[in-house]
Amino acid sequence: MKKNRLLFRVIILLILSGAVGFTLYQGFFADKEKMQIGKEAPNFVVTDLEGKKIELKDLKGKGVFLNFWGTWCKPCEKEMPYMNELYPKYKEKGVEIIALDADETDIAVKNFVNQYGLKFPVAIDKGQKIIGTYGVGPLPTSFLIDKDGKVVEQIIGEQTKEQLEGYLKKITP
């Protein structure tokens, strides 16, 4: 009985130590890698859930709202319907919304997209390479990229519909 309790405590301690260590590691390196406002957004190539290739450099001339999210993320879930509602209006004005999932299974992401009827391009960041390049920490995190391919702003956290629309206006060409 005492051995089981001791083993349980050691396991919990190891898990907590690992979580704290990971958090400190992420915080330390995220500051070094953080995307710089006013600089060119790093190019990336992904394939969306429809099988269409998306390359950031091909979107020059358009504003890009780049959103990093996860199906398990409640704030992400709350803001997705706003993005979906505003997408057609701003697509006509030259703004593209791209949602990059944080390396979950295809089935989980497809189910989420179908559940919410998302119309904008959604892709999965396999291996979290793009997340690493952009220095993303907590989800949701979004980047505003102007028509010249420069990062205008980084937004961390959930957005209201009004905030989101303000950001989309900001990058409308």
Swiss-Prot record:
Localization, UniProt: Cell membrane
Pathway(s) of this molecule: Protein modification; cytochrome c assembly
CDD domains, alphabetized: TlpA_like_family (cd02966)
Pfam families: AhpC-TSA
GO CC term (a single one): plasma membrane
Transmembrane segments: 10-29
Mode of membrane association: Single-pass type II membrane protein
Disulfide partners: C73-C76
Highest taxon, organism lineage: Bacteria
Keywords: Cell membrane, Cytochrome c-type biogenesis, Disulfide bond, Membrane, Oxidoreductase, Redox-active center, Signal-anchor, Transmembrane, Transmembrane helix
A molecular-function term among this protein's GO annotations: antioxidant activity
UniProt key word Chloroplast: no
GO aspect biological process, one term: cytochrome complex assembly
Matching SUPFAM superfamilies: Thioredoxin-like
Physiological role: Thiol-disulfide oxidoreductase which is required in disulfide reduction during c-type cytochrome synthesis. May accept reducing equivalents from CcdA, leading to breakage of disulfide bonds in apocytochrome c; following this reduction heme can be covalently attached.
PANTHER family cross-referenced by the UniProt entry: THIOL:DISULFIDE INTERCHANGE PROTEIN DSBE (PTHR42852:SF6)
Protein name in the entry: Thiol-disulfide oxidoreductase ResA
Species: Bacillus anthracis
Gene: resA
